[in-house]
């Protein structure tokens, strides 16, 4: 049965629908939480929070948050961490991904930075692309100024959303070409599309 029809039948029958829950712990304090909280989900709740720390420190913090919430009776259906390679050492980045997965988290990583996911909404970029170029490129492509400090406005989210399927396809194409087990060497790439695909199931 179509999931939307199922949800409608559930509401008609008077049975309260149990929503899926997402815990999304992000490296950035503005851009990433703004973006994920902007998804208009009908059958899921999202707790996306930024911590201002990266790789191993972020994963340790995420584990602590999940455990603290569990003690309060909050258990999430999906747990995610979102972080960037930036200039962190290769071993730190790869170890953070492994530690997250060992503790029940899925990982949406970007090499070098989260904004690479935004760029893929417009074009397929292959090969190394330094993050210092992202803001200027995005401002040109969007037609209005973007800065990492400003976060994701509703105007920006609405500009990106219609191009989302293209971004997913571009990200998948890149990941297939790398095909290895060393994320720190996969420049430029992102697995943010994996989290986006999960969120899209609950639109």
Question: Where does each model-flagged region fall?
Answer:
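Alpha-helical scaffolding within the catalytic cores
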Residues: 61-68
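C-terminal accessory helical subdomains adjacent to catalytic cores in phosphodiester-
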Residues: 1-4, 8-23, 32-49, 68-80, ...
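Short, charged, surface-exposed secondary-structure boundary motifs
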Residues: 55-61, 117-120
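Helix N-cap/beta->alpha junction signal
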Residues: 27-29
